[in-house]
Amino acid sequence: MIKSNIPIAIVWFKRDLRLEDNEAINSAIASNKLVLLLYVIENSLIQNDHFSIRHLNFIKQSLVDLNQRLAKFNTEILAVSGEVQLIFEKLSKQFLIKKVYSHYETGIDITYKRDKKIAKWFIENKITWHEKRQQGVFRGIVDRKNWSKLMNSFIDQPIKPLPEMKNKLVSLKTLKQIKKNFDLLELKTEHLN
């Protein structure tokens, strides 16, 4: 496997599976780097008591929908199975990852610990991680004195349309080569009775 010296940015989709009004995508496109769209289904998360087959089916259906909409840009989301750090380690052997964009996730302890761990790995590997807010939860504030002000400034922002992405995303041809090195997420959903 030959490493590309072309600097890239990665949009790491977590729970925010949308294209429009997605600050992570807008910022990655504005970075003027080639952008790889990534979704990782984590084995540790699937095995967590909070997760069910319905979650997995929703994720798969959302990825199928997003990929259909991304086809006009000659790309799709690289949807892989594995633990996040191992996935980024593999990608860093193939690309010069400069920046990662994702939303600022709030939720369960397992994802909080994962984010702390991957943040450390990004720093050690000189990768800048930009977490974009997509809702009104603000971690780490001591009291609620300024919460209303923070929340209002967040919700008063205009909805951001999908930016122009032609020739700014990793192509299907390149993705075909990348996929050879990963366990891909099967996007077919299971029928539930």
Question: What is each model feature region?
Answer:
Residues 135-148:
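Glycine-rich, charge-decorated loop segments at or immediately adjacent to ligand/cofactor-binding or catalytic sites
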Residues 1-75:
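N-terminal beta-strand-loop-alpha-helix module at the start
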